[in-house]
């Protein structure tokens, strides 16, 4: 009985997840007594090894909103196939609201050429050589969601070969 911990939930194990806050906004809700202020945090969570997620958290204080955003991001993780050259297998396109994102693979040494929240999503996914362009809306949340949709649409060469029911060696031959 003496070795029991008082609250085992507070012990957090060390993880390799990284989180970056894309935006913190003060939002208000009009109630009978006036305006109720709270904070909305958009957070991108990733392990830089092919897993990434975007979360939104709202709370009365900034720290609480970020914490909720991280939890929400971990609930909405996607797997991203990354090639040996730390790029993506093929060009892809995603939409989130009025935001459209185009992502293309790039040669080794190119780096992440992208702007805003799309850059954050790609970096935390572990993609090192990629070109991306935001089209339409510049809303950070919709652009992050569009980037996630684009990355979720990626398929590996193995998946394409299985879909076509041919060996992977015959994928390129005519």
From Swiss-Prot:
Molecular functions per Gene Ontology: rRNA binding; structural constituent of ribosome
GO biological process: translation
Matches recorded under InterPro entries: Ribosomal_Su5_D2-typ_SF, Ribosomal_uS5, Ribosomal_uS5_bac-type, Ribosomal_uS5_C, Ribosomal_uS5_N, Ribosomal_uS5_N_CS, Ribsml_uS5_D2-typ_fold_subgr
Keywords: Ribonucleoprotein, Ribosomal protein, RNA-binding, rRNA-binding
Entry keyword Ribonucleoprotein: yes
Residue ranges of every copy of the S5 DRBM domain listed in the record: 17-80
Domains: entry comment: The N-terminal domain interacts with the head of the 30S subunit; the C-terminal domain interacts with the body and contacts protein S4. The interaction surface between S4 and S5 is involved in control of translational fidelity.
Family recorded in the similarity comment: Belongs to the universal ribosomal protein uS5 family.
Protein function: With S4 and S12 plays an important role in translational accuracy. Located at the back of the 30S subunit body where it stabilizes the conformation of the head with respect to the body.
Protein name: Small ribosomal subunit protein uS5
Lineage, top ranks: Bacteria, Bacillati, Cyanobacteriota, Cyanophyceae, Acaryochloridales
